[in-house]
Amino acid sequence: KEAIDWVRKNAERGADGIKFFGAPPDIFKAALIENKKLGLRSACHHAQMDVARMNVLETARNGLTTMEHWYGLPEAMFEDKTIQNFPLEFNYMNEGNRFEEAGKLWKQAAKPYSKKWNDVMDELISLDFTIDVTFVPYSIFRDVQRGSSLPWHKNYTRPQLLKFFLPSRESHAAAYYDWGSEMETEWKNNYKLWMTFINEYKNRGGRVTAGADSGYMYNVYGFGYVQELELLREAGFHPMEVIRAATLHAAEAI
């Protein structure tokens, strides 16, 4: 009831929608359902500590409009588990642990074009669900040396931001302080599976939009969005499909 009242008050104040991160399932469902009843839109970064309780398929069924990143999407396609296969010493608050294990997630989901993979994709499309991909921020994990030495940083990235980007145990997502070829290989393979899903989602009529999530991991505003468009092209989008994701489909989503 408190969640429903909160959503109604949010609408009364003139909000266009709500950005969610996660909540206990009963509260999350009530808020999503009421938000949709009121004709408002919704977005969600599915917090990794909540996806075992509410993955993307479950939030979409309850009225979620769009998702960001990929959190909660592979989890919806698990066939032999309900929680990612974390090592026993995993510590979510350790950024190195968090992002190293994130690079091993997509291979734990159903294989591309398998029944489970197809069923999840087709249901999301039937729900008119939008995926806002944000390929670019995580691309640093495929090649840290390249990402940290891109030519525009010298002239366009503020010194304070460059300092924040340096490998660190404190700065969010600057997780490459103990990084090497094995992690980068995992992430390259992770991207292949992620991009396969996104490209096929688009091919079947699903709405995909471009988002940069700049401000972290050598991902700078302005430049990051162009990189995102390039990564959609890498995923298999035709150049016109890339432009549509950044324009028409983005407008439809909001």
Where are the regions that the model predicts?
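Active-site neighborhoods of metal-dependent hydrolases
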Residues: 6-17, 73-230, 234-235
